């Protein structure tokens, strides 16, 4: 532990909190256009083909965002809405595409947690 004199000579440094979703610029959602839609493989213990899209946002940022749910209709030039939220086993994927908004359709035949996947109530 430093002495009072040491603290006077060199004060304590405040820890700088880094922004986890810089492209959002303090907005809850952002609109963008898909520039590339592809699959990628997750980190070590997991194995799958995760669906992701490269999105050019309205503020000029280009980010990689995850497409949640089973099946999607996205292709190049699709207009999408993204939100923050990383995918733990995909390095560099820090955003999610919102299903059921703009050009993104909701997940078909979804019965539980429908609001998260933009699915209408089944009849």
Swiss-Prot record:
Keywords of the record: Methylation, Ribonucleoprotein, Ribosomal protein, RNA-binding, rRNA-binding, tRNA-binding
Keyword tRNA-binding attached: yes
GO biological process, one term: translation
InterPro entries attached to this UniProt entry: NA-bd_OB-fold, Ribosomal_uS12, Ribosomal_uS12_bac
Tagged with keyword Kinase: no
Residue numbers bearing the 3-methylthioaspartic acid modification: 89
GO terms for cellular component: small ribosomal subunit
Gene Ontology MF, one: rRNA binding
Role noted for this protein: With S4 and S5 plays an important role in translational accuracy.
Family annotation (PANTHER family): 30S RIBOSOMAL PROTEIN S12 FAMILY MEMBER
Subunit text: Part of the 30S ribosomal subunit. Contacts proteins S8 and S17. May interact with IF1 in the 30S initiation complex.
This protein's name: Small ribosomal subunit protein uS12
Organism annotation: Rhodospirillum rubrum (strain ATCC 11170 / ATH 1.1.1 / DSM 467 / LMG 4362 / NCIMB 8255 / S1)
Gene from which this protein is expressed: rpsL
């Amino acid at each position: 532990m430093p002495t009072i004199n040491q603290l006077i000579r060199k004060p304590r440094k405040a820890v700088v909190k880094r922004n986890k979703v810089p492209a959002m610029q303090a907005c809850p959602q952002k609109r963008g256009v898909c520039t590339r839609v592809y699959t990628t493989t997750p980190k070590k213990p997991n194995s799958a083909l995760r669906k992701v899209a490269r999105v050019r946002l309205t503020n000029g940022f280009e980010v990689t965002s995850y497409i949640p749910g089973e099946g999607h209709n996205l292709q190049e030039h699709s207009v999408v809405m993204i939100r923050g939220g990383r995918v733990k086993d995909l390095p560099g994927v820090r955003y999610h595409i919102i299903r059921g908004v703009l050009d993104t359709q909701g997940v078909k035949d979804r019965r539980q947690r429908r609001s998260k996947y933009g699915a209408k109530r089944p009849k």
